[in-house]
UniProtKB/Swiss-Prot annotation:
The gene is rps4. Residues 16-40 are annotated as: Disordered. One of the primary rRNA binding proteins, it binds directly to 16S rRNA where it nucleates assembly of the body of the 30S subunit. With S5 and S12 plays an important role in translational accuracy. SUPFAM superfamilies: Alpha-L RNA-binding motif. This is Small ribosomal subunit protein uS4c. It is found in: Plastid, Chloroplast. GO terms for biological process: ribosomal small subunit biogenesis; translation. GO terms for molecular function: rRNA binding; structural constituent of ribosome. Residues 89-152 form the S4 RNA-binding domain. One of its GO terms (cellular component) is chloroplast.
């Protein structure tokens, strides 16, 4: 399966809030969940929805998600927690959480168009894994700084997780440490994803 490029509000109505996918919210009167799906949910459907939440929020393909689950399964710690740490430490997600991009697809585009430097080097791979003490900056040209300035101005500084710090004047972000489970930006039961 390829990356999802279809209507985003349909996915939000179906799966609930996905802040990484879009900032838009559906109208309060148009709740398709209550209209079509009543009664008891089956276990398979619950697990599938949790997996789809993870996929659409982080903008992953099915194969990428399976690869991350495989890597997390080899770790000695809790598989679900390691999976979330791997996904949260991706460069595109880190840019989104810093407020340098309004959505994860927007952050992915910034990285692909070579506007972002990590430790002074251009990185154009959105799945680049950030490590503690990595410094994330914008390129030194005006266009790159304008793109990031608009996103920082519209972001909420109170939502910045504890493992990241940002200098809004120099458009510079710092990864302090590896993320704790309580600072994940998505309400999800990661064990159901691993079981799926």
């Amino acid at each position: 399966m390829s990356r999802y490029r279809g209507p985003r509000l349909k996915k939000i109505r179906r799966l609930g809030a996905l802040p990484g996918l879009t900032r838009k919210t559906p109208k309060s009167g148009s709740n398709l969940k209550k209209k079509f799906h009543s009664g008891k949910k089956e276990q398979y459907r619950i697990r599938l929805q949790e997996k789809q939440k993870l996929r659409f929020h982080y903008g992953l393909t099915e194969r990428q998600l399976l690869r991350y689950v495989h890597i997390a399964g080899k770790a000695k710690r809790s598989t679900g927690q390691v999976l979330l740490q791997l996904l949260e430490m991706r460069l595109d997600n880190t840019l989104f959480r810093l407020g340098m991009a309004s959505t994860i697809p927007g952050a992915r585009q910034l990285v692909n168009h070579r506007h972002i430097l990590v430790n002074g080097r251009i990185v154009n791979i959105p799945s680049f894994r950030c490590k503690p003490r990595d410094i994330i900056t914008t390129k030194d040209n005006q266009r790159s700084k304008d793109l990031v300035r608009n996103s920082i101005a519209s972001s909420d500084p109170g939502k910045l997780p504890k493992h990241l710090t940002i200098d809004t004047l120099e458009y510079k972000g710092l990864v302090n440490k590896i993320l704790d489970r309580k600072w994940v930006g998505l309400k999800i039961n990661e064990l159901l994803v691993v079981e799926y």
